[in-house]
Amino acid sequence: RRQRQMCIRDRLEAFSRPLWALVPFWVGGGSDPEFEKIYRKGLAAGTDPENPEYWGTTGEYDQCYVEMAAIACGILTAPEKLWTPLSDTGKQNLAAWLGQINAHTIPDCNWQFFRILVNLALKSVGMPYSSELLEDGLCKIDSYYSGDGWSTDGASVQKDYYIPWAIQYYGLLYSKFAADIDPRRAALYRQRAQLFAQQFVYWFDADGAALPFGRSLTYRFAQNSFWAACIWAGLEPLPLPVMKGLIVRNFNWWLGQKMFDRDGILTIGYCYPQMYMAERYNAPGSPYWGMKSFLLLALPDDHPFWSAEAAPMPALERLKPMPYANMLVQRRAGRITAYAAGVNEGHGHGQFPEKYAKFAYDTRFGFCASRSREVLNQAAPDSMLAFVIDDNVFVRKVSKTWEIEAGAVTAQWSPFPGIEVTTTITPTATGHRRHHEIDSSFDCEAYDCGFAVPNFAPGYAESVENDTAEAHCDTLRCTCLLYTSPSPRD
C-alpha cells in the first residue's frame, strides 16, 4: 500500500509542477488546448474518490501538500482554465481534496505557505476554507524572519535557496493575492523582498552562474525565480534591466549545461545527471519545480520587461558579509566565492556536510558529494579539512560557534570526539587563506583540500612539489600552498 501511495505522489508531482509554467503561460495570453484538456481531465480524475486515478486521502506531513500549491495558484490566477470548466461535482471534489491540508499536520517550514495558498484559493471560489489556519500559517512564516530579508526555513537553521525560491517567492505571491484583505502583511513581505534583493544579487556571477550551495539544487534555474516574482509583483528592488540581466544570463548559463536526457526531460542532478547529490524526496518530476521561474510568462505583452535591455551586473562590494546568511561572499574577476560558516541542522535530509559545511563554494567550481567515507578520493572532501582515522574520513558536519566579520569567517567545530578545530578563512586578492588550530587527543592524518577540478576534463593534470599542490584543466585551476606550525602539548 505504501509503495502504491508513493507512486501516486510521484505521478502527482510530475503532473502538478509544470503548472508553475503553464498557468503563467495561460495568464499571459498563451493557448494550448491539448494541455488545457489534459489538466482539466487530470484534476477531475485525481480528485474523484470513485476514479481509479484518484490521488487518495492524505495524511500527516504528506507530499501531496507540496503539489497543492501549484494547483491553488492556478485557481487564483487562471480559474477559467482550471476551475470554471469543471462540473459542480468536479468542483466539490477538487475543493474537498485540497481542503485535506487543513485536517492534518504539516511541517513547520515553508510548507506553511502551501496551506496559505490553498486557503486563499478556496476562499476565492467560495468554497469552505480555514481563516484560523490561514492566520496561523502567516504567523509562523513571520516568526521565521531573521534580518536583511533573510528568514530561516522554519526550525532549520541553515540559509539556502529555500529562502529566495520559497519563503520570498510565496511572500511576493501573497503580496498580490492578499493586497486588499491583508495590506499590512502584503507591504511587509514586499519590504523584506527589497532588503533580500540587496543580498541575493551577490549569489550570481557575471556569466550567469549562481552559487552552488545547499539542498535541492536539482531545481536548477529556480535560482532566478525570486527575480521573476519581483517583476511579476511590480517590485523593483533593483532596476528592471538589471533584474532582466540576472534572469537572462542565468537561463543562458543553464541552457549550456547537460541537464536534459536524450528525450529532452530534465534529469535529477545539477550541471549533469548526478544521483549522489539527490535528495531522498526527489522523484522524476522533481526538477520541474524550476518552472517557477516562468512566472514571467504572465506579464502582458506591453510590460516594460519585454523591451528592456538585459543590463550587466551592477557595481557591488568586493567582500560582502552576510551575517544573517551565515557566510562571507567574495567577488573576484566576475566569479563568486562564498565562505560558509558551516551552519546547518546537522541531520535530516542527508549530505549536509557537502552542501553546507565546506569552507568555500564557488560559481566556477562544483562541489563533490561523497560516495564513501572509507577512501579519501571517494569521500571527495573538496574545500574541507579531512581527518583520516582508522581508515575512515571525517570532516566538518556543523559548526559549534561561528563569527562572520568584514574580512574573515571563524568557526569552531569537531570532526570526531577528541579533536577540536578552530578555522579562520580570510579572502585574499588571489583566493583565500585558511588558518586551522587543531587540538587532537591522538595521532591522525589531516588533508586540507582545495576546490574540485574534474579529472575527465580536457587538459587535466595534477602535481605536487614540496608544500605546493596543483590541479588544473583547460578551464579551471586550483593551487594549494601548505604551511604548518606544530604546537605540541606540554
PLM feature segments, named:
Residues 1-5, 12, 16, 26-37, ...:
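Terminal-appendage/accessory-domain detector
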Residues 3-10, 483-488:
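Conserved small/polar residues in nucleotide/adenosyl-binding loops
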Residues 11-25, 32, 36-228:
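Aromatic-lined, polymer-binding surfaces characteristic
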Residues 12, 65, 284, 322, ...:
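Solvent-exposed loop and beta-edge segments used for protein-protein assembly and interaction
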Residues 50-55, 94, 205-212, 217-348:
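Carbohydrate-active enzyme catalytic cores, enriched for enzymes
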Residues 140, 248, 451-454:
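Amphipathic alpha-helical scaffolding segments
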Residues 338-341, 345-409, 413-416:
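Phosphate/adenylate-binding glycine loop and adjacent helical scaffold
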Residues 391-485, 489-490:
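Extended repeat-based interaction scaffolds and adjacent low-complexity, acidic/S/T/P-biased segments
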